[in-house]
Amino acid sequence: MATCPPFDFSTKYYDGDGGCQRQSSFFGGTTVLDQGVGYAVILGFGAFFAVFTSFLVWLEKRYVGARHTSEWFNTAGRNVKTGLIASVIVSQWTWAATILQSSNVAWQYGVSGPFWYASGATIQVLLFGVMAIEIKRKAPNAHTVCEIVKARWGTATHIVFLVFCLATNVVVTAMLLLGGSAVVNALTGVNLYAASFLIPLGVVVYTLAGGLKATFLASYVHSVIVHVALVVFVFLVYTSSKELGSPSVVYDRLKDMVAKSRSCTEPLSHHGQACGPVDGNFRGSYLTMLSSGGAVFGLINIVGNFGTVFVDNGYWVSAIAARPSSTHKGYLLGGLVWFAVPFSLATSLGLGALALDLPISKDEADRGLVPPATAIALMGKSGSLLLLTMLFMAVTSAGSSELIAVSSLFTYDIYRTYINPRATGRQILKISRCAVLGFGCFMGILAVVLNKAGVSLGWMYLAMGVLIGSAVIPIAFMLLWSKANAFGAILGATSGCVFGIITWLTTAKTQYGRVDLDSTGKNGPMLAGNLVAILTGGLIHAVCSLVRPQNYDWSTTREIKVVEAYASGDEDVDVPAEELREEKLRRAKAWIVKWGLVFTILIVVIWPVLSLPARVFSRGYFWFWAIVAIAWGTIGSIVIIGLPLVESWDTIKSVCMGMFTNDRVMKKLDDLNHRLRALTMAVPEAEKIYLLELEKTKKNDEEG
């Protein structure tokens, strides 16, 4: 007869009176932290970052000389360096789902879950580096992806893809707030709807003040906090905690979890709780990459995340903001560092939840509560507070990126295109800020509606590819294929979306006999819908373009103009002409294509194939797996924290020197700068001579 409770270490989760009843859920409607802590985190951190980032932007304006024009607000001067771009990509791609859903799939499928989450969402960023270079080559003055669509394919196509891009921002924002509000509510008891409205508040404030540059600066600070928390949790699970503390303990417990001697009949098992062998895994083990559920999730993840990178204007805005020589390197580095966030974190907190035999229910897991449960079990209140802080950083950072993405679309693709084509820089800046405020309010309303409807983070994450995946290949063709035509782009994107949704719902009805949130959230219908959407969209566009090729030369995309020219003397926006040379950009494209494909093949094909012969991991193999997770997370954290500081050291020194310099001197220098700007604007030749002399000086400094 099976022992009850089955494990000594999880006795507290079982009630021995009148049998052996396991807790029906981990949280059970109770909270670990007070409501006051929840409000303090939401409002306190929000206010702090609003003030802090606004102060950093003011310091740059005051002591470095950056000018806050509409171009600067929406593009950050198009001169952001590799380290900060990589940090922004990591921060932008670290959603609530990255922290929460990755551990959910670890809880469901074992070691394959974190791997497929990380690899399935890294390759898109690596490959998007190609698009980032193509923007510099073919649309150097663009502000949004839809602006490029209109320049190439005209008004009808522009409207279609504007809808897809805005829909992507809505989907991503929904996931951020669903995950964030669920965790805040579970840990602190803050009202779910109040959390939905308050979380975006601080983001709106600092984005309003500083635009894209404030978003980038905040993203860096948020990224630092996320990576510090990541390293703490990884080392806690595998080195220092009393409950676990080593890969050997985690390994032994994961083996015991599926042992045949363990009874998983009522009342030990409850609907949806982890208990016994894993259906679809080799020998039911959590310690294997031979997992049908994990592989299907991996496919859904790959398809869905192509949509949320290629169709999210936020990534195009980051590419536009990057210095040409930094673009490809920033995206590659950002992708590789980001891999560690879901892989290392979920390999720790996700597998840790299983190794601790936590009574997490399916509903709790779907809402993203696996990581907070593990953090509480290992660290108590301090663990829940650290996890809450980490999640808040991820949600607000990615949320600010979505705000700027939507702001740019409303400003340049709606207001400047259809309402006021002759808009001045001041008018555009005003509309940008109104769009930030408006979408911030919409974010809160959207989260309330979805929570009322019972939509979970897990469901939304799997469904995103069905809704927006059909636009991926047409958008890629826009900059990569001269024959791609407008008719095929419209037909492919719209038809792919319709066919994807029909396939998704039909498969759910056929397999489960009903169409509801539960049946449509299963892997089978989700996989079918995702694949049909992305493949149909691409196939239709390709066929139409081969039948009637456009043979485009990108002349109209190169003619996109900036609203306000940057003034010479602004160091932050003087991009050397050398960086925009076609030959140099071609070399950069060849570099990112080569290394993007190498790392894509490595993490999607070679790594999983090499792990299959291990079948069920041995103790030594699991030690190796855990060490890779620890090392990747630690090294990635050091790089993403240190590199932006090294690259920006001159600016940091300028600000520090300026802060301790006599303010009268600074005012005189400001006056001199204004006079010089007026002179160069009045005499254009003077500006050309200045730029030539500046390039010569930089070359001499480099040679010296």
From Swiss-Prot:
Induction: By nitrogen deficiency in roots. The chain crosses the membrane at residues 39-59, 80-100, 115-135, 159-179, 192-212, 216-236, 291-311, 336-356, 388-408, 435-455, 461-481, 486-506, 527-547, 590-610, 622-642. GO terms for cellular component: plasma membrane. The keyword ATP-binding does not apply. Its main location: membrane. It comes from the Eukaryota. InterPro entries: DUR, Na/Glc_symporter_sf, Na/solute_symporter. One of its GO terms (molecular function) is symporter activity. Expressed in root rhizodermis, including root hairs and cortex in more basal root zones. Expressed in shoots. Pfam families: SSF. One of its GO terms (biological process) is cellular response to nitrogen starvation. The keyword Cell division does not apply. It is found in: Cell membrane. It is a multi-pass membrane protein. Disruption phenotype: No visible phenotype under normal growth conditions, but when grown with urea as a sole source of nitrogen, plants are chlorotic and accumulate increased levels of anthocyanin. The urease inhibitor phenylphosphorodiamidate (PPD) has no effect on urea uptake and translocation or DUR3 gene expression. This is Urea-proton symporter DUR3. It comes from Arabidopsis thaliana (Mouse-ear cress). The lineage of its organism: Eukaryota, Viridiplantae, Streptophyta, Embryophyta, Tracheophyta.
